[in-house]
Amino acid sequence: MNYANFGLELFKSIADAAYEGKRVELAGKTLALKNRALDTERDYNYARLAFEKQRFETNADLRVNGDLYRMQALRAAGYRLNPFSNGHQIYADEAAAANLHSYYGFYKTD
């Protein structure tokens, strides 16, 4: 054993142990960051899958019930709509009032 190099070897072994500890610590932090990135990516993919599923179900629902929803929305907005009419959408009391006014207008004698 060479006592001249004993101090250097001791110092080198301490430095190597510190370096190895720091390397292990950094490797642990790197692994934690990679796990966090993978968790974030997984959460994003699940959210995207849920959105795509909702979009597909909404599109399928609109393909089946879209006209019904449109009619309900227009009626809720105050439009008087009859899906079976020919475009002359007038109610019976309005027709009676129109006939009455046309009668008075046509047979006006004053």
Swiss-Prot record:
It comes from San Miguel sea lion virus serotype 1. It is found in: Virion; Host cytoplasm. Its main location: virion. Belongs to the vesivirus VP2 protein family. Homooligomer. The portal-like structure consists in 12 copies of VP2. Interacts with capsid protein VP1. InterPro entries: Vesivirus_VP2. Transmembrane segments: none annotated. Coiled coil: none annotated. Translated by a ribosomal termination-reinitiation process from the bicistronic mRNA coding for VP1 and VP2. It comes from the Viruses. The N-terminus domain points away from the virion surface. Keywords: Capsid decoration protein, Capsid protein, Host cytoplasm, Virion. GO terms for cellular component: host cell cytoplasm; viral capsid, decoration. This is Minor capsid protein VP2. Signal peptide: none annotated. Minor structural protein that forms a portal-like structure at a unique three-fold axis of symmetry, following binding to the host receptor. The channel formed by VP2 may allow the delivery of the viral genome through the host endosomal membrane.
